[in-house]
Amino acid sequence: MEINFVNKSKKNDLDIKSIDGKTVISINVKNQSNYDIDQMIDGVERFLDKKINVNFTNIKGEDAENLLLKLNNISFSYTNPPKYNIPERYFPLLNEVEDYKKIVIEPNKYQDTMLKYFIKKIPKNYTYKKFSLKRNDKNFPLTAAVGAGSSHKSYFLHVFPKKHNKNWDDIFLIGKCVTFDSGGMNIKVRNMEEMKTDMAGSAIIMGVLNLTNKLPKNINLLIPIVENYIGSKATRPRPVLPSISVKTVEITDTDAEGRLCIADAVEYFNEHLYNKNLKNPLLIDIATLTGHTYYISCSTSSIVMGNKKAKRYMDKLYECGEQTKEFIDILQLRENYVKSLKSSVADIKNWSPQCKAGTLVGGAFIDFFVNKNIPWIHIDVAAVVYNNDKVKSYGINLLTKFLEKI
């Protein structure tokens, strides 16, 4: 089976032929919108085997990049004859996208498996620290509370350069890795079958690191690895727990678990990594955080918010989204959002019925823990990594281009 993208004026939009006993599908992209190309690919997917060859004719540069990223939920090999002129930098991106889709689409990848997978993918010029969490872990108390009901251990992984260069910018990427999210004691009543993808944020940043580890930047990955499950030891609603910095959190909803894990990662950064000698530090978290993003973006873009210090970075991220066709929508975080999370028994609660804007409230909760001296961006990708039974290869190209440009 072979699929060709062509760019010719005098050619049908879609041709399916049998040549020497092999099915050859040609998709003409001349004057076609991204939506039209998506529709054509969706229309022929039922003909495709698990392994196909992807070839290009008269398509160059970013057009080829953006087209190939539309081949979601299928596996492919690819060739690069000289006449096709596909940029060399793109082939590592293809590999990372393929790895991302495979790990996200497979269910029941438990914490041990994910930890080994991530460690195996760490570039040679990087190293790591791993933390095995106890049930009432004082170093990562909120993540430990999320994983209390699981029969599998929870972990925290910190990936960082073997040699820190003081002249390079310091970038910190947090990726949510909830291997499966049942909702905990506040059990999900719908769409639980999609929760195998709740570790997409961590898979995205690991792919990004493998594409950017040669850039003149000190890139750190912070990954809480946990399963939010039901069991006799699962965290009940409304306990009050201390965070790493001893800020107290009332857990009013065990299904708002992602923000708890990210808060641990943010405070790990605050307590152990932040210092005044960092050069242009930037903190970014990326997570499948809230289902409310479906109502905002119609599954076409991620939702982004951040603090005032990060405005120029968010503007640059928006530009990169337009270039890569991995779009973002930027929302404003206002003080009244975090006020809705005020607790009578703790410093903050992780969910409140007082504000129905769930995506904004999730961001506001994380913002409560962020060091105000640091530019911080929150990227909620819940609506764009999994839709209509397909894993979407969103985020890797976007963040790679962003880190190349800042």
Q: Could you say what each language-model-derived stretch is?
A:
Residues M1-N165:
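Glycine-/small-residue-enriched capping loops at alpha/beta junctions
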Residues K8-L14, I19-D20, K101, Q111-I406:
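A generic structural signal for tightly packed, nonpolar segments enriched in small/aliphatic residues
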